[in-house]
Amino acid sequence: MRSKENKRVEFGAKVNNIQIDGISFIEHHSFEAFNEGTRLKQCVEYQQSLTGVPVTRIGMDTIYANNENRKYCTENSITTNFVRKGLGPKDEPAEISSARRIIGNLRATVMEGSFGNQKQHYGVGRIAARNRHSETLQLFFGIHIITVR
């Protein structure tokens, strides 16, 4: 069960998506609650296994901005849209702050927009399945059918 302030409660499976050039992939789904903020490393590894290309930039929701993920991104030279903790260095290049802003805006428009489309037009937000197997199939087709359009 998931909820957001001022939003209706959602039941059923919880899905952790990644997007590569606008195409959604299901990285993890479960009928048990999980914290997607702890799955950054798995998301990066999954994307690298799909594309064969090292990840250099990631746009993520604020739930991913924990210390462990910040350290992982720094160690692997991955630019993120995370807001800095504390005061930033005075000599930070304008390109870095500009990249953070662009990555954040792209994530917000593309990723959140795809969630809205999946829920509204492809039935992902509706309770239509009567068991876990049917719901898993509905999620798969609802998320992946948008790719072929």
Which positions does each model-derived feature cover?
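A glycine-rich, aromatic-flanked flexible loop/lid motif
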Residues: 11-23, 85-90, 114-118
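An internal, acidic/charged active-site-proximal segment
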Residues: 51-105
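Generic, well-ordered alpha-helical scaffold segments in large soluble proteins
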Residues: 20, 43-46, 50, 76, ...
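Short, conserved catalytic/metal-binding motifs centered on acidic residues
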Residues: 17, 40, 55-66, 80, ...
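Basic, amphipathic alpha-helical segments enriched in Lys/Arg and hydrophobic/aromatic residues
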Residues: 100-149
